[in-house]
Structures are given as structure tokens and as C-alpha cells.
């Protein structure tokens, strides 16, 4: 472990990732992983509240989103590379194990990182998206398959990008239907559509077919909280209910009432408190 120092970027796989490193430098580290179609900016409100609780937050713009970390081809976005990115970030920090948090696709990366490298994760908080195995089981046994229709559309090459760029009103109505505010939608237009991150973000979906089946069975052995909101149009309650079956450690399911999919912005105060409780409980457990 090295003395804490601020970082603005980290390197991995020949790529350069942008990082927001804020909060008390000597605080316990919370790594916040964003999802689609957003950047690390989506964590701003939650991060500020965690700073008030004494945490240092590390928020990367992930693979496909950072301007210098946009490899071509969907194979470069398979789960093993996303985990390796997160491991490289934690190694760059040099502060030892972290409290790992992920929302949406960031939750997928967080689940897989905690399963593969529990030595680097003190606690895990996942938001919206459950363990990959729970998600698949929900697809086969609930309305999750219908909710996930867009994932199949995103498998098409270049057509989703063309549709999103050529029909901005359709994008606006679609995102508004998920609970996004006008300000959030404008941010998506600026950061993702105009900012050149659209294909990279979609490639996370397109790489799903390359992910190793073992990820569906991987066990998580660190204290974990999964957060699901009942206003989420993309993820079913059943998917959340199944998540705990993949955790061999202290586990809690938190259900937020009247909150949409966009929990880090819409319910930042509640989420920061949940992250703090998960981290505090994990830190107090005997090794």
C-alpha cells in the first residue's frame, strides 16, 4: 500500500481512462462505476454526500466512454475486460481494498469484479442490475424478457446509432419514459451522442455473447447490498429478489419506493446512506 495521491487518469490495455478523484484524500475509498447511457458525472450528487461522510470517491469514465479508451469492435467490451479495467484502477490507487459500487452496467462490472477479485473489495453495493445469473433466471421466469427488448435491438450493427442520431425526439421520449429528467436527457445528448461515446456504450450490450458462462454461476464472498427501485422500467422485482442467492456473505436487499431506474441522481441521499451502512458494516466485521 502506498501513500494516498490524487489521480486524474489510469492506463490499461493501451487505453487511458479519465477519473474523478474527490473527497478527503485520507478517507476510505469508494469506487463508483456508471452505466449506460451516462458517464461518471451521473455520480456527482451521491459522491458529494459520501464526501460529507468522510469517504474519498473514485469515479472513472469507463471503457467506451473516456475519449482515449474507445477500442473498436465489440469483443473488446466483454466482461473480462471490464473487470480488468476495474482491477487496474484499484491497483493504480495503491490504497488496498475498496468499497465498490456500480449502477446499471457498472453494477455488472462490480458484481463480476467482486466475484473474481474479492481480495480487492471490502464491500459491494450494486444498484438496479442484479448478479448476471439472477438476471438470466429472471429473463426466463418473469417479465424481464419483455423489459429487456432493447438489448436485442442493440445487437444490430450501426442501425441503433443511426436511429438515435437521426431521430432525437424518439430518444428523448424513450429516456423520459424511463424517468430521466430533461436535464439528464440533455446530458446524454452532450456526453454520449455528440461526445462520441454512443458506439462504445452500445458495445457493452453487443459483447454479451462473448462473456464466459462461468460468470452466471460466480459466487460473491464479500458483504453486499443490492438496491432496486420499484419505478425501474428496465429491471424486474424478480431479478432483484434472486440476486442474494449468489452471495455467500452478509447480504441485504434494499427496495426504494417511487424511484425510477436513475437512482444515483434521483435518490442520492438514500443511496449514499445505504453505501455508508454497507461499508461501515463490512469494515466492522472481523477478518
Give a label for each model feature:
Residues 2-6, 12-17, 29, 58, ...:
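Flexible "cap/lid" subdomain of the alpha/beta-hydrolase fold that forms the substrate-access gate
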Residues 259:
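Conserved short acidic donor-positioning loop in nucleotide-sugar-dependent glycosyltransferases
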Residues 20-69:
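Conserved HGGG/HGGXW glycine-rich cap/lid loop of the alpha/beta-hydrolase fold
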Amino acid at each position: 500500500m502506498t501513500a494516498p495521491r490524487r489521480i486524474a487518469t489510469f492506463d490499461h490495455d493501451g487505453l487511458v481512462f479519465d477519473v474523478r478523484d474527490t473527497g478527503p484524500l485520507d478517507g476510505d475509498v469508494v469506487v463508483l462505476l456508471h452505466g449506460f447511457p451516462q458517464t461518471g458525472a451521473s455520480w456527482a450528487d451521491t459522491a458529494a454526500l459520501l464526501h460529507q461522510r468522510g469517504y474519498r470517491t473514485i469515479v472513472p469514465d469507463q471503457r467506451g466512454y473516456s475519449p482515449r479508451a474507445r477500442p473498436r469492435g465489440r469483443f473488446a467490451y466483454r466482461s473480462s475486460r471490464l473487470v480488468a479495467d476495474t482491477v487496474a484502477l484499484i491497483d493504480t490507487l495503491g490504497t488496498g481494498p475498496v468499497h465498490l459500487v456500480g449502477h446499471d452496467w457498472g453494477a455488472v462490472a462490480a458484481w463480476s469484479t467482486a466475484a473474481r477479485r474479492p481480495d480487492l473489495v471490502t464491500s459491494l453495493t450494486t444498484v438496479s442490475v442484479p448478479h448476471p445469473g439472477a438476471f438470466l433466471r429472471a429473463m426466463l421466469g418473469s417479465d424481464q424478457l419483455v423489459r429487456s427488448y432493447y438489448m436485442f435491438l442493440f445487437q444490430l450493427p450501426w442501425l441503433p446509432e443511426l436511429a438515435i442520431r437521426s431521430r432525437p425526439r424518439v430518444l428523448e421520449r424513450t429516456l423520459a419514459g424511463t424517468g430521466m429528467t430533461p436535464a439528464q436527457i440533455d446530458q446524454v445528448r452532450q456526453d454520449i451522442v455528440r461526445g462520441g461515446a454512443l458506439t462504445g456504450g452500445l458495445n457493452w450490450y453487443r459483447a454479451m455473447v462473448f462473456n464466459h458462462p462461468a460468470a452466471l454461476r460466480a459466487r460473491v464472498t464479500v458483504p453486499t447490498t443490492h438496491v432496486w427501485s420499484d419505478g425501474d422500467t428496465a429491471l424486474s422485482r424478480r431479478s432483484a429478489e434472486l440476486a442474494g442467492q449468489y452471495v455467500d456473505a452478509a447480504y441485504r436487499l434494499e427496495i426504494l419506493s417511487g424511484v425510477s431506474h436513475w437512482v444515483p441522481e434521483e435518490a442520492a441521499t438514500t443511496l449514499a446512506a445505504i453505501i455508508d451502512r454497507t461499508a461501515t458494516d463490512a469494515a466492522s466485521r472481523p477478518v
